[in-house]
C-alpha cells in the first residue's frame, strides 16, 4: 500500500514535469510567431511612415517655395512703390527749389529797388532839412525872434487857449452836475420837509413865575432873606425880584436847574407855606418831577421817531435835551426833526433808514452833558455812544455832522444834510448880533482878499455874498474859477448854518462923451 502511494506520487510528479516542458515549448513557438509578425508589422509601419514623410516633405517644400515666391513678389511691389514715392518727392523738391530760386531773384530785385528808394529818401530828407533851416533863418530874420523865443511864444498861446478851454469844460461840467444834483436834492429835500412838521420853541436863559399878588414877593424873600437864599442855594438859580408886577424872574444858564426852581417855586406859592424846610422838600419833589419829565420826553422821542433798543441812560440823556437850546432852537425837537428828515431822505435814496434815523436822533446827544464834561459835543457824544454799545456805523454817522470827520457812508452824509436843513430853516435858530456881524465882516474880508476884487457885499443875512471884480483882471471864464476858490476858502475858514451863495459879477462899461 505504501509503495503504491509513492509510485502514484512519482507518476504525478513526472506528469507535471512533462506538462511543464510541453507548455514551455508551446509558448516559445507561439512567442516566436508573434515576434515574427511584430517585426513584419514594424517594417510595414516604417515603410508607410517613410512614404508619408516623403509625401509631407514634398508638400512642405512646395508650400515653402510658394511662400518664398509670394514674399518675393510682395517685396518687389513695395520696392516699386517706394521708388515711385521717392521719384515724386524728388520732383516736388525740384519744384520747390525752382520756386525758391525765383523768389530769391524777386527779393534781390526788390532789395535793389528799396536801396534806391532809401537813397532817394535820404537825399530828399537832406534837401528838406536844408530848406527848413533856410526857412527858419528867414523867419527869424523877418520876425526878429529866435526859434526858442518863437517856441515859448507858441507854448504860451497854447497854454492860454488850453486854460480857456479847460475853464469852459469845467464850467459846463459843473453846470450840468450842479443842475442834476440840485434837481434831485430839491426833490428829495422837498419831499422830506413836506412829511416833517416839528414845533420849535425858542428858549432863553430866564423863566418867569407869575404871582397871585405882590405881597407874595415878601414871603418868598423871607425874614432877612433866608427863604430866597435857601431856594437859590438848593437850585443854583438866581431869583430876581424887582418892580415887575406880580412876577418873579428866575435866571440861570442851566435850563434843568431853572426848571426845577420854577416847579418848586410854583408849588410853594400854591401851598402857601414858605420856609427853608418846606423849600427843601419842594425842591426835592421838583427834582423828581423833572427827572420823570426828562425820562418821558426821551421815551416819547424814541417812540415818535421809531428808534428802539436804546440804552436807558441814552433815553434819559435824550430827555435832557428838552431843556437845551442852540441859537434859540430846542435841541430835542431839532434832533427829532433831523431823525425824520434823515430817515425820509434815506428811504428816497435806498439807504439804511433805521441807521439814518438812529444817528439823526443821537447826533446832538453830547449837548446833554457838554456843560459838565470837557470837550466838544461831538466828541462827548461819540464817547457816550461807545460807552452804551452803539454800533460803529451809528457813531460814524453822528460824528460827521459838523465836518470834524470825513463821511464814509451815505447815511452820514444824510444826517449832516438833515442837520443843516433843520438848522437853516427860517425861524429855527437865531444868533447874537455880535456873532452875526462878525460873520458878515469875515465873509467880506475873505472875498476882498483876492486880487482883482473891487467890492463885495454880504447880503440876505449872510446867506449870499456878491463880489464885483475888475473886468480887466478876469475874463468871463476865469470868474468861475474865482467863485470856486472863494467858496472853498469860506468852507474852510467859516462856521455857518445852511449854505452861502457866492455870486461873482463882472461888468464892462464903455463910456464916451459927445462934444
UniProtKB/Swiss-Prot annotation:
GO terms for biological process, alphabetical: mRNA catabolic process
Q: Keyword check for Acetylation, yes or no.
A: no
List the PROSITE patterns hit by this protein, alphabetically: HD, KH_TYPE_1
- InterPro entries (UniProt xref): HD/PDEase_dom, HD_domain, HDIG_dom, KH_dom, KH_dom_type_1, KH_dom_type_1_sf, Ribonuclease_Y, RNase_Y_N
Annotated EC = 3.1.-.-
What are the alphabetically sorted keywords of the record? Answer: Cell membrane, Endonuclease, Hydrolase, Membrane, Nuclease, RNA-binding, Transmembrane, Transmembrane helix
Mind telling me which GO cellular component terms the entry cites? plasma membrane
User: Where does the HD domain lie?
Assistant: 331-424
Q: How does it sit in the membrane?
A: Single-pass membrane protein
**Compartments, as annotated in UniProt:** Cell membrane
| Domain KH residues, every copy | 205-290
| TM stretches of this protein | 6-26
**CDD domains named in the record:** HDc, KH-I_RNaseY
Q: Which GO terms describe its molecular function?
A: RNA binding; RNA endonuclease activity
Name the SMART domains for this protein: HDc, KH
**Family, per entry:** Belongs to the RNase Y family.
What is this protein's function?
A: Endoribonuclease that initiates mRNA decay.
Q: What is this protein called?
A: Ribonuclease Y
